[in-house]
Swiss-Prot record:
Entry-linked NCBIfam families: S21p
Organism: Cellvibrio japonicus (strain Ueda107) (Pseudomonas fluorescens subsp. cellulosa)
Cross-referenced Pfam families: Ribosomal_S21 (PF01165)
Source species, domain of life: Bacteria
Protein name: Small ribosomal subunit protein bS21
UniProt-listed Gene3D superfamilies: Ribosomal protein S8
Family: Belongs to the bacterial ribosomal protein bS21 family.
Keyword Acetylation set for record: no
UniProt GO molecular function: structural constituent of ribosome
């Protein structure tokens, strides 16, 4: 669990923002959303495979764009 020590004369909003950033870095909210309801192992594998395919297509498109000559 992330913790934030409030500095002297530090506004509450700033401390809250630092806490939110620490929680996001730790991945707490993503973990809570993932565990919110049960997901079958086959569904997990299918979703992760689809994400890998999407990442690969994005990478290939970025690499092919590098070599396009515009002259």
């Amino acid at each position: 669990m992330p913790s934030v020590k409030i500095k002297e004369n530090e506004p509450f909003d700033v401390a809250l923002r630092r806490f939110k950033r620490a929680c996001e870095k730790a991945g707490i909210l993503a973990d809570v959303r993932a565990r919110e309801c049960y997901e079958k192992p086959t569904t997990v594998r299918k979703r992760e495979a689809a994400a890998a395919v999407k990442r690969h297509a994005k990478k290939v498109q970025r690499e092919s764009k590098k070599f396009t000559r515009l002259y």
